[in-house]
Amino acid sequence: MDPPNSLQQGIRFGFHSSSFVENMEGSQDEDNLRLLASAASGSSRDTETPTDHASGSAGGAAGGQSESRPGPSGGGVADLFPELRRLP
């Protein structure tokens, strides 16, 4: 069964012209670009985030001391759950 107007074949039901869809997509791309730019500028101002990635996979801090960060990858399970420190 063919649509009533073959010129509007690629347009979804409910849209009567493609100009609205094109304008909507353009503003979405622009919004995404602004969001990406604000996230990038916000992370560059973060003083807690180290910018030196030369330590490699060893993950050691300068001076040979281990770097401690909050979260599951920093310090191990015993730091997250103090009751586990008592276990042998």
UniProtKB/Swiss-Prot annotation:
Region annotation (Disordered) ranges: 23-88
Species for this entry: Human adenovirus B serotype 7
Record carries keyword Cytoplasm: no
Protein name: Early E1B 9 kDa protein
Domain of life according to the entry: Viruses
InterPro entries in the cross-refs: Adeno_E1B_55K_N
Keywords: Early protein
Keyword Magnesium annotated: no
Miscellaneous comment in the UniProt entry for this protein: Residues 1-86 are identical with residues 1-86 of the E1B 55K protein.
Upper lineage: Viruses, Varidnaviria, Bamfordvirae, Preplasmiviricota, Tectiliviricetes
Compositional bias per record (Low complexity), positions renumbered to this chain: 34-44
Signal peptide segment: none
